[in-house]
């Protein structure tokens, strides 16, 4: 690589030396103003060498030496991707060297870096520039018009490869206004400028004329180390390690003029510095440096003096060295900040627009700036004073801050690099003024951002904006004295920007703020300290200050408003964060204010006890809920309606229909409530669950007794007292441990007015009879055993006793009162009627109770009226939950439950006493005595879903407990009854099924026609024992038996019956025989015309007789019939008797009879010869002539009377249908001829009338006609075959079948579905008849065979419906936009798409649609019929060929 670089360097040096020598020769001869005569063809260099040459020149050449030239001005033009320094010499515009130098400092570029200069776009632009140069070189032969003051431009790096004419007639892409004599040429120039692109407008050449770097460093990083930064600041040469640069030469410059375009508006900017700032003389411009930035290096300043400047300008002071050292040291300390800023602005470079570019003119008095609002205004000429007064404020408002900072940075670096010790005072004063200007601009920008009304800022080139912001960021990082002020402003700006601006805008604003302070900080530089006393500013700077002060008042007002908004926003945000920090650790919600309660009123506490306004629900609603969720919601609403906390004005309670009124009233009273706490006796517990739910009975043995928080004890005072509640729990555990066998009892009420005389609850005999006061804490047994059977009632004057009694009885464990079963359990006067209504509803719903075992034996029933309706024979069974699964039950209790007879009271009492003394554990079942007569318990193997499993022996062995004999088997989750299809012993073998798929995957090399799977029938379930079937026929849910059927449906298979192997499948018949009677010929019957005969054909198959209509008998004796008859052929032994020896030779006999009708002629025409006299002579004989004539005479006898039978039968033909006949005509149309026989004719009597007709002898059977018949037999091969009614339809069906089989097409199709699960594959398909075969698209191996006979329909793309009616995904929309889909009869779908033209897709769809439509003609008999026809055709063709060969 180094060898290649060195070779290129040597080549470039040789080229430069040759151009230098040629240039010197031309200069000596005094022919600088004439066009050059030397050229260097670009074609010989090559593209790669040209690119390297351009890069080398644009980085290595940073100086230009013009000898013998007048002072010239430099105009800095910022192009799209490059900065071209063009020198234009104008002898007419003579200005002071100080003003020229001041303007150069203003327009210079400091530490600029173009990050995108080595991008492919820039290299492409460079190639275009080279092509333009070549084009301009070819135009040098044209006549030129020399001006009095020729304009020239100087290339800073190398001699031009091609010469350029100096005539103003020669035009380039960028033109500046000049004095032309020809107005037409001016118009042409303006038009040319308007038609050029923005990239060409600003440069006559596309070769970058900027500082360049050595070829050895073509690819540099975006960041530099401090050493390289020092070198770039100290030296103006390239960053090449050799420190050597190519000599720069000058060539004539083309005149150019910038005219306004719709994208450009002229803006003038000029700032004149004192003449002392310049080191150059009026006669030489050799000391000037190029103010443009280099292309490759991003962080190298190219306008600082270097080795060459020190040689050319030997007069340098110590102050210059000090200033340079300070700057270098300051930059070394902050270089890492520059790197960070660069990385930060990288994102901004990508998002910037490339359209707007700012052009700062140095020789010209105007600047061109792109604006967002383009106008077609002409170029406006301003004087230097007007441009300062008008254009400078407009430019400051329109352009971004980064542009100004860029210019200021260039100015600052120029001051550092070119000023002397005597000039430092001017620079310091100038910077003081610039600091004030930048403060004003900063406030103006902040106000604009705060009000979200940005000024019209022209967009800049991304490269320009990027390295400008980087330089400004570095300037800010070098500022330490003003850091505190920057942090305050940045904090205010970031707080507001986070809420109002996007992250990208915050980055931009942040960079601008940093630039402002960085620029303001220039006052504190050492350069400013050394010259603080000199305050002599140029006139242009004063004018600029005046113009910028015009907007000062407006900016200050906006600044005040912005600061106020920022302060308020900061306060709000700080308060918000404080509140957030305080709220995070506590998490305490704000509670609503408590309502003001009224005092408790005890007026009339026991009178209005039946008031249900605050109760849960109406009594009739308790049976309505059918599921647990509904019950739970009802309970929740009713608890809230009864609770004072929820009825009050609480925002946490749910507003139900009951609590709405009270809540509204409470809101009106400002927190007070109308709720009156009326203490009343709760005589009824509201129970809401209508369904029976059996809870665990032994839950308090394993865990602590937990009192339920149900709705009916929500207001229980004892429940609210924790100490009392714990005491009750301990007492319950103690009593259960001491007397676990004592059963709770309920008394019977025999009051006459109670309405409960006929309802008895069997209870135990209590041991004690005493009233327990409310203040005593009662245990469970104290409560449940203190009431006897001696007509003693519970006290009804306390609330707690009744409520505790019901609750503790329910939680006793041995007797379970489900809340859904007991609608009301009050012990007052209204209990009887409520409980009677409940029993009626209970009987209607076929629900029952779980009762204690001590009451089971006391079941009494009215023997006078018995009406049995077994509960377990209903359509459903109740299932207990798995909590009491397999719970043992005493055998004697179960025996009493199953007994149908009753026992007297003495036996019941005896049994009860025995049970009390006998220790046992288990489930108690209480019996409810009721007068309802239509409910009884009969003997059965299952009761309420409980199955009784009896032991094999009646007597159980010793040591076996009572609970071991009989257990409760429950069908809760059907775990014990997994009904798998199997073949049990002594069961019928299941019917085999044939499962066929609409498509089947074909293995490579083994393509099968059928893919059958034999499975067991799901209908055959393993039979159960007799004990199980007695009580569980209705217990098995239908969904269980249908589970596997549903699984099969999801597997997308079609099930068809298959013929068993051991049993012959029975068909309804053997098939259908079609007989077509074509004609009867050679009929031996004369005198048809005179008898006016008619005929009919009678068809008799032994079962049915069919007769054709009567028609006229033709005179010629040939009858054309053309009648078809359908004849089902039964099996041979179907009509046989029990004797197996007698077999018929034929299946059926078909008789065809010809019947005739005729009219007897009334008269008979007889020919007679009549003798007619002709004349008579007088003396002669009479003459006669003989005439023949026909006369009618009454016939003596008719010959037809002896030809017909009495029913008119004349001829008969019997067709014997046997195996041979069927074999000959099977699936084939055969033509046959049969003789029709007359066996009814008689011999006529010679003496007419001597004998009667039936006494005459018969003639022997003889042939009277010939019968032509076509027969075809369609044999049945499947019980599901359907045959047409007419033979003419057979031919049509066969023709349609042939048409289907002849359909053929092949091509590539995209397949989705079928054997491809979750993927799409392109395959080669062949459609042949009803078979669609898929092959691998490359290897053509068989992959899938699709049976189109199972396709029900073919859908187009618009008819295809996605699953669940949803929209199709994007992949399907792209790949299957114009597709078609096959829908099978089992729901399977396969989608196809053809990657071809629309005509080809339509052809695929039409042919598949035609095949599916012709599926109705596809039956087994059709296929066999066509095969037989094909065989006959082949035989006929073979015979014909043999005959031709023989001949």
Curated annotation (Swiss-Prot):
Q: What induces it?
A: Cell cycle-dependent with low levels at START and a peak in mitosis (at protein level).
Q: What is its main location?
A: other
Its subcellular locations are: Bud neck
Where Phosphothreonine occurs along the chain?
Answer: 365
For the region Disordered, what residue ranges are annotated?
1-38, 57-76, 272-316, 444-479, 529-591, 648-673
One GO biological process from the UniProt record?
A: protein localization to bud neck
**Bias (Polar residues):** 22-32, 59-76, 277-316, 538-548, 648-664
Protein function: Required for establishment of the axial budding pattern in haploid cells. Cooperates with other bud site selection proteins to recognize a spatial landmark during mitosis and they subsequently become a landmark for downstream polarity establishment factors that coordinate axial budding and cytokinesis. Involved in the septin organization at the bud neck.
Assembly mode: Interacts with AXL1, AXL2, IQG1 and SEC3.
Q: What is this protein called?
A: Bud site selection protein 4
């Amino acid at each position: 690589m180094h060898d290649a670089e060195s070779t290129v360097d040597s080549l470039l040096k040789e080229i430069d030396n040759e151009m230098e020598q040629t240039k010197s020769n031309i200069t000596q001869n005094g022919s600088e103003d004439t066009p050059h005569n030397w050229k260097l063809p670009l074609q010989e260099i090559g593209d790669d060498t040209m690119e390297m040459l351009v890069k080398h020149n644009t980085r290595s050449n940073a100086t230009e030496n013009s000898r013998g030239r007048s002072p010239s001005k430099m105009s800095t033009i910022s192009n799209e991707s490059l900065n071209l320094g063009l020198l234009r010499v104008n002898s007419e515009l003579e200005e002071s060297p100080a003003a020229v130098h001041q303007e150069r400092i203003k327009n210079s570029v400091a530490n600029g870096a173009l990050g995108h200069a080595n991008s492919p776009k820039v290299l492409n632009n460079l190639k275009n520039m080279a092509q333009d140069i070549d084009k301009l070189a070819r135009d040098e032969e044209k006549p030129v018009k020399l001006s009095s003051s020729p304009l020239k431009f100087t290339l800073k790096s190398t001699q031009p490869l091609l010469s350029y004419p100096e005539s103003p007639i020669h035009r380039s892409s960028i033109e500046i206004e000049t004095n032309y004599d020809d107005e037409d040429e001016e118009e042409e120039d303006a038009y040319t400028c308007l038609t050029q692109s923005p990239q060409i407008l600003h440069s006559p050449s596309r070769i970058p004329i900027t500082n360049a770097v050595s070829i050895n460093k073509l690819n540099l990083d975006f960041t530099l180390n401090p050493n390289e930064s020092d070198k770039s600041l100290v030296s103006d040469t390239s960053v090449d390690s050799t420190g050597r640069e190519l000599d720069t030469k000058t060539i004539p410059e083309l005149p150019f003029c910038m005219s306004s375009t719709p994208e450009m508006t002229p803006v003038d900017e000029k700032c004149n510095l004192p003449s002392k700032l310049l080191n150059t003389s009026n006669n030489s411009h050799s000391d000037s440096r190029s103010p443009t930035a280099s292309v490759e290096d991003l962080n190298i300043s190219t306008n600082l003096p270097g080795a060459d400047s020190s040689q050319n300008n030997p007069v340098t002071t110590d102050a210059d060295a000090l200033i340079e050292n300070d700057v270098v040291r300051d930059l070394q300390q902050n270089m890492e900040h520059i790197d960070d800023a660069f990385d930060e602005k990288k994102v901004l470079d990508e998002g910037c627009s490339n359209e707007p570019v700012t052009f700062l003119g140095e020789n010209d008095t105007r600047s061109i700036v792109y604006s967002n609002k383009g106008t077609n205004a002409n170029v406006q000429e301003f004087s230097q004073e007007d441009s300062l007064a008008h254009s400078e404020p407009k430019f400051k408002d329109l352009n971004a801050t980064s542009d100004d900072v860029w210019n200021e940075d260039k100015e600052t670096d120029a001051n550092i690099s070119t000023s002397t010790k005597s000039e430092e005072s001017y620079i310091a004063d100038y910077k003081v003024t610039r600091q004030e200007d930048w403060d004003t601009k900063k406030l103006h920008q902040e106000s604009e951002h705060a009000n979200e009304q940005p000024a019209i800022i022209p967009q800049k080139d991304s490269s320009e904006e990027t390295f400008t912001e980087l330089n400004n960021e570095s300037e800010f990082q070098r500022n330490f004295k003003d850091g505190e002020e920057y942090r305050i402003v940045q904090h205010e700006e970031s707080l507001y920007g986070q809420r109002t601006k996007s992250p990208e805008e915050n980055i931009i604003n942040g960079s601008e703020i940093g630039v402002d302070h960085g620029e303001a900080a220039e006052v504190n530089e050492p350069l400013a300290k050394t010259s603080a006393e000199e305050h002599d500013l140029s006139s242009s700077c004063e004018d600029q200050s005046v113009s910028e002060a015009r907007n000062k008042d407006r900016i200050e007002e906006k600044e005040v408003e912005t600061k106020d908004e920022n302060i308020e926003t900061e306060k709000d945000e700080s308060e918000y964060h404080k509140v957030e920090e305080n709220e995070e650790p506590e998490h305490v919600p704000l509670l609503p204010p408590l309502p003001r309660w009224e005092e408790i009123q005890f007026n009339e506490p026991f009178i209005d006890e039946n008031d249900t306004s605050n109760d849960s629900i109406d009594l009739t609603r308790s049976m309505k809920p059918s599921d647990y969720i509904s019950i739970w919601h009802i309970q929740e609403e009713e608890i809230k309606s009864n609770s004072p906390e929820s009825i009050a004005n609480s925002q946490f309670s749910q507003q139900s229909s009951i609590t709405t009124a009270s809540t509204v009233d409470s809101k009106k009273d400002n927190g007070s409530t109308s709720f009156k706490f009326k203490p009343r006796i709760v005589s009824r517990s509201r129970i809401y669950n209508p369904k029976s739910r059996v809870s665990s009975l032994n839950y308090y043995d394993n865990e602590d007794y937990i009192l339920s928080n149900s709705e009916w004890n929500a207001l229980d005072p004892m429940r609210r007292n924790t100490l009392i509640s714990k005491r009750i729990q301990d007492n319950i555990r103690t009593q259960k441990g001491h007397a676990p066998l004592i059963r709770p009892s309920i008394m019977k009420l025999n009051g006459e007015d109670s309405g409960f005389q006929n309802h008895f609850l069997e209870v135990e005999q209590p041991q004690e009879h005493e009233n327990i006061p409310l203040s005593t804490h009662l245990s469970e047994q104290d409560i449940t055993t203190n009431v006897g059977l001696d007509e003693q009632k519970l006290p009804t004057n306390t609330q707690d006793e009744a409520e505790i009694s019901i609750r503790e009885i329910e939680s006793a464990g041995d007797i379970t009162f489900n809340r859904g079963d007991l609608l009301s359990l009050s012990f007052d006067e209204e209990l009887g009627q409520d409980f009677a209504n409940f029993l009626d509803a209970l009987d209607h719903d076929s629900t029952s109770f779980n009762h204690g075992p001590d009451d089971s034996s006391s079941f009494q029933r009215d023997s006078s009226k018995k009406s049995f309706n077994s509960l377990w024979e209903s359509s459903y069974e109740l299932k207990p939950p798995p909590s009491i699964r397999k719970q043992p039950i005493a055998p004697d209790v179960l025996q009493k439950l199953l007994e149908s007879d009753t026992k007297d009271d003495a036996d019941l009492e005896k049994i009860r006493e025995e049970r009390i003394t006998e220790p046992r554990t288990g489930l108690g079942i209480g019996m409810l005595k009721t007068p309802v007569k239509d409910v009884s318990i009969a003997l059965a193997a299952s009761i309420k879903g409980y199955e009784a499993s009896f032991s094999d022996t009646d007597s159980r062995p010793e040591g076996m407990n009572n609970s071991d004999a009989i257990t409760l088997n429950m069908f809760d989750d059907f775990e014990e009854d997994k009904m798998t299809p199997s073949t049990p012993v002594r069961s019928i073998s299941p019917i085999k099924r044939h499962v066929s798929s609409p498509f089947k995957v074909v293995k490579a090399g083994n393509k099968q026609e059928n893919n059958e799977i034999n499975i067991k029938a799901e209908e055959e379930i393993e039979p159960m024992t007799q004990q199980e079937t007695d009580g569980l026929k209705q217990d098995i849910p239908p969904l269980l038996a249908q589970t596997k059927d549903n699984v099969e449906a999801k597997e997308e298979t079609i099930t068809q019956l298959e013929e068993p192997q051991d049993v012959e499948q029975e068909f309804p018949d053997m098939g259908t025989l079609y007989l077509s009677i074509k004609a009867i010929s050679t009929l031996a019957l004369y005198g048809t015309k005179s008898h006016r005969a008619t005929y009919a054909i009678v068809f008799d198959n032994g079962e049915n007789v069919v007769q054709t209509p009567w028609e006229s008998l033709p005179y010629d004796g040939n009858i054309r019939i053309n009648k078809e008859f359908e004849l089902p052929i039964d099996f041979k032994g179907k009509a046989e008797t029990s004797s197996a020896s007698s077999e018929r030779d034929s299946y059926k006999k078909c008789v065809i009879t010809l019947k005739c009708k005729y009219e007897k002629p009334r008269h008979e025409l007889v020919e007679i010869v009549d003798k007619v006299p002709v004349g008579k002579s007088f003396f002669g004989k009479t003459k006669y002539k003989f005439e023949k004539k026909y006369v009618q005479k009454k016939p003596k006898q008719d010959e037809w009377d002896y030809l017909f039978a009495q029913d008119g039968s004349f001829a008969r033909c019997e067709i014997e249908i046997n195996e041979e006949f069927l074999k000959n005509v099977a699936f084939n149309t055969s033509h046959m001829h049969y003789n029709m026989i007359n066996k009814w004719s008689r011999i006529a009597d010679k003496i007419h009338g001597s004998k009667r007709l039936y006494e005459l002898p018969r003639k022997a059977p003889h042939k009277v006609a010939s019968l032509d018949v076509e027969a075809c037999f369609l044999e049945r091969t499947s019980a599901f075959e359907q045959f047409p009614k007419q033979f003419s339809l057979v031919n049509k069906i066969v023709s349609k079948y042939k048409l289907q089989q002849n359909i053929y097409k092949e091509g590539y199709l995209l397949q989705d579905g079928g054997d491809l699960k979750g993927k799409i594959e392109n395959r080669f398909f062949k459609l042949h008849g009803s078979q669609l075969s898929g092959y691998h698209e490359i290897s053509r191996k068989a992959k899938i065979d699709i049976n189109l006979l199972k396709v029900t329909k073919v859908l187009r793309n618009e008819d295809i419906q996605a699953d669940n009616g949803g929209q199709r995904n994007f992949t399907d929309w792209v790949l299957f936009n114009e597709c078609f889909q096959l829908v099978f009869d089992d729901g399977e779908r396969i989608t196809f798409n053809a990657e071809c033209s629309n005509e080809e897709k339509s052809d695929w769809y039409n042919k598949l649609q035609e095949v599916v439509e012709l599926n109705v003609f596809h039956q087994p008999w059709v296929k066999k019929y066509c095969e037989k026809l094909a065989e006959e055709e082949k035989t006929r063709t073979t015979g014909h060929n043999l005959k031709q060969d023989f001949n």
